């Protein structure tokens, strides 16, 4: 009933019949993850993440009413619901404070690529903490780990030559910094009007003021007075959802590229500074690009002297079976953002790489513009850099991208075998990243009623069986640790299938009640 109260509170604008149906549903199943979206706002529902079911912790060791203002969490949840508290990790698994074991199918937040117990990373952090726990990188002072990491990243990225690396603490900071760097670059070239950015609907580039503006998710804009006016959004390249009848993937990609060019011409090419894209869209629902998409988009932005920013925060370091997503899709970016797997998430760190053409301008024009007055106290933190250096060594020594190539076919095929389910609209993915979208009649135009919480039902069924997934409306996302074993892949597929069957049964009950 606690969850029901919160759900009813969050959906106060819905009809009374919807509220009654929702209350009946929650009390009858006890498994619904809180749906905080307004039932009348389909776009918000589609893009908003759903919390975990209430923890089984007792009142004594629970944390209901805790003092943390939690990210991407409705305020009432912190007060009314015990959070799921994770206490330790081991390989591809995490354990809650009650000792229950979960297969972590999202690798934390797309990030613990090497699992939760890699001793070499812990050793690297410990040794650096004893040697030099902190020093900054301002005013031409820095540390050996930051210099070594920059050198290693530049050598690892082979999609094209890159010139310099700038360190941040997260992917949000990386994309935020990209905007300031590009503005600085255009000011150095005497192009003060070339300042607009084009991103894509359903993209995710972070949650700071600027990176949230770049993101194309309504939940990141609503109630925050975003996006910023210098950010434009173009089409989402989701073929299943947005293609026209009879339109092939290549034709769809051509239409989107043409739409992008029309937007550029409408705004004026002299005002557009950069285009930013994830090689595979992550938080927007795991959306791989349609065939020829990046080939056509790159040609358009190059034609109008617009920089291409590859947001590799999720796709870098083996996730797709290549070291970088740019390798997979033949992207030749001018700038690259990365974070997450850079340290396997053991220590916060992010980075951006810039092409020689951009770094040369920053160098040559520095006497005119002065210093690049941007950075963070913890930019190039020596402990974070030491851990990241060790992570990069492991990715290469163990050939993690090749391991992903070997186990990902079973991961993809095993889950996609359930695509025939009557409640599944589409299952999509590449490498070790995969999304499931629930829909009625297998049509993107027939979503299930929001108050049913189909995605939330599936997430709760997975959690009950010992697997954590990400739920966002009726989208399910999985991005497991890159070290997964074949047996763990089989476990994932098995739990997915069992949870899907239970969800199908619940949807059938809801349909029956609706029709009676």
From Swiss-Prot:
Q: Which GO terms describe its biological process?
A: biotin biosynthetic process; gamma-aminobutyric acid metabolic process
Family matches, as InterPro entries:
Aminotrans_3, Aminotrans_3_PPA_site, PyrdxlP-dep_Trfase, PyrdxlP-dep_Trfase_major, PyrdxlP-dep_Trfase_small
Q: Region entry Disordered: which residue ranges?
A: 45-64
Where in this protein does the record say N6-(pyridoxal phosphate)lysine is found? 340
Q: Does the keyword Transit peptide apply?
A: yes
Residues that hold pyridoxal 5'-phosphate according to the record? 171-172, 311
Q: Which GO terms describe its cellular component?
A: mitochondrion
Major location category of this protein? mitochondrion
**Pfam families annotated for this entry?**
Aminotran_3
Q: Which organism is it from?
A: Oryza sativa subsp. indica
Transit peptide, UniProt annotation? 1-47
Location(s), subcellular:
Mitochondrion
SUPFAM superfamilies, per this entry? PLP-dependent transferases
This protein is called what?
A: Gamma-aminobutyrate transaminase 1, mitochondrial
Q: Which family does it belong to?
A: Belongs to the class-III pyridoxal-phosphate-dependent aminotransferase family.
- The biased composition feature labelled Polar residues covers 45-60
EC numbers listed for it are 2.6.1.96
Q: Show the catalytic activity.
A: 4-aminobutanoate + pyruvate = succinate semialdehyde + L-alanine; 4-aminobutanoate + glyoxylate = succinate semialdehyde + glycine
